[in-house]
């Protein structure tokens, strides 16, 4: 089947996934106000295109963390991808490799980080801070040894947000899906009505990260450390002072603090505040190449895309993810050209205006 929009892939995923697994992917925390706001915020951003530009050689490539990428985009970390397709993370990594796009291996991946990184391409590793600091730093070492190019340190999960869909469903992992990077025990598989077994188990495994945790990670690796989950300008400035190679402006896809400001709302302020001191990425609600253009016009180095990649994985495995990335590449190039931009650098010089949705 050919998909012409990301919405097509969402519908296809909904058709094939069990309801509780689709809810695990789609849901946010609490009333899902931040989840909805992520889309609303993007829809309010309008780009002011430039005309009469030379568009004979439009390129969507960027340099990020010292290497070339085909798009101003990376695959976001998503846990337990074998929930959505038997090949899970391996299918996503292969498609991202072939598309020239970085992909982020999650601490809670359902295939080991070494197996995923062996696919090649541009793997990054996402780190959750565990109660045992030694285990956290061991994951960093393993990621570096496996060839990962950056450590994406998620800092907005002292514990999981209240994800009511999962609680109502009594969501638990099926026996054939595990956290492959460490012995996670069996708690996440124990189904209890009114309780998310995944959230309950995460609360036992995770610890709140602090600036001291950031320093410990930086001291343990030569890789760029990217802090994911930054929303306050003050935290962005401190991240630069702490030596972060990048930040991801993010409210965790609306899955942590319900009511947290959308990342796209804070992006311009944060880009101005860090003043080139580190790479600034953004995520939350990216659903088209036009959204990627909006983010770059607001100053983003790149965007992270999560849920749509999982829709594609569920719909058609590696081929689905390939189609998604090809579709986004086509949409990004099209949007850039229509805005009068021959490069991502030119897109970052576009002006924007907030409208009413």
Curated annotation (Swiss-Prot):
One of its GO terms (molecular function) is FMN binding. It is an enzyme of class 1 (oxidoreductase). PROSITE patterns: FMN_HYDROXY_ACID_DH_1, FMN_HYDROXY_ACID_DH_2. Pathway: Antibiotic biosynthesis; vancomycin biosynthesis. Residues 1-357 form the FMN hydroxy acid dehydrogenase domain. A 2-oxocarboxylate binds at residues 128, 163, 255. The active site is at 252 (proton acceptor). Its cofactor is FMN. GO terms for biological process: vancomycin biosynthetic process. Its EC number is 1.1.3.46. The keyword Flavoprotein applies. The keyword DNA damage does not apply. Signal peptide: none annotated. FMN binds at residues 126, 154, 228, 283-287, 306-307. It catalyses: (S)-4-hydroxymandelate + O2 = 4-hydroxyphenylglyoxylate + H2O2. Keywords: Antibiotic biosynthesis, Flavoprotein, FMN, Oxidoreductase. SUPFAM superfamilies: FMN-linked oxidoreductases. It comes from the Bacteria. Belongs to the FMN-dependent alpha-hydroxy acid dehydrogenase family. Catalyzes the oxidation of p-hydroxymandelate to p-hydroxybenzoylformate in the biosynthesis of L-(4-hydroxyphenyl)glycine and L-(3,5-dihydroxyphenyl)glycine, 2 non-proteinogenic amino acids occurring in the vancomycin group of antibiotics. PANTHER family: 2-HYDROXYACID OXIDASE 1 (PTHR10578:SF107), S -2-HYDROXY-ACID OXIDASE-RELATED (PTHR10578). This is 4-hydroxymandelate oxidase. It comes from Amycolatopsis orientalis. The lineage of its organism: Bacteria, Bacillati, Actinomycetota, Actinomycetes, Pseudonocardiales. The gene is hmo.
């Amino acid at each position: 089947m050919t998909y012409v929009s990301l919405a097509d892939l969402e519908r296809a995923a909904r058709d094939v996934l069990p309801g509780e697994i689709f809810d695990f992917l789609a849901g946010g925390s609490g009333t899902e106000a931040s989840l909805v706001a992520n889309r609303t915020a993007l829809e309010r951003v309008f780009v002011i295109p430039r005309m009469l530009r030379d568009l004979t050689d439009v390129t969507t490539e960027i340099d990020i963390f010292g290497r070339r990428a085909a798009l101003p985009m990376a695959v976001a970390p998503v846990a337990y991808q074998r929930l959505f397709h038997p090949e899970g993370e391996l299918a996503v990594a292969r498609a991202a490799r072939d598309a020239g796009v970085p992909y982020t291996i999650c601490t809670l991946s359902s295939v080991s980080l070494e197996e995923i990184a062996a696919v090649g391409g541009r793997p990054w590793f996402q780190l959750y801070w565990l109660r045992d600091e030694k285990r956290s730093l061991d994951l960093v070492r393993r990621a570096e040894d496996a060839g990962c190019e950056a450590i994406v340190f998620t800092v907005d999960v002292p514990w999981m947000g209240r994800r009511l869909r999962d609680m109502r469903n009594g969501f638990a992992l099926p026996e054939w899906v595990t956290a492959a990077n460490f012995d996670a025990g069996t708690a996440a598989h124990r189904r209890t009505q009114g309780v998310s077994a995944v959230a309950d188990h995460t609360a036992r495994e995770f610890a709140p990260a602090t600036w001291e945790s950031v320093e410990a990670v930086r001291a343990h690796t030569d890789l760029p450390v990217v802090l994911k989950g930054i929303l306050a300008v003050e935290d962005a400035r401190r991240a630069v002072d702490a030596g972060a190679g990048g930040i991801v402006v993010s409210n965790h896809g609306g899955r942590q603090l319900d009511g947290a400001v959308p990342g796209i709302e804070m992006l311009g302020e944060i880009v101005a505040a860090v003043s080139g001191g580190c790479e600034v990425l953004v995520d939350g609600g990216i659903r088209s190449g036009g959204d990627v253009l909006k983010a770059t016009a607001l100053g983003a180095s790149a965007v992270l895309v999560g849920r749509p990649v999982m829709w594609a994985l569920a719909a058609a495995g590696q081929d689905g993810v390939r189609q998604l990335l090809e579709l986004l590449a086509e949409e990004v190039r099209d949007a850039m050209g229509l805005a009068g931009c021959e490069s991502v650098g030119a897109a970052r010089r576009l002006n924007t205006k907030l409208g009413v949705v």
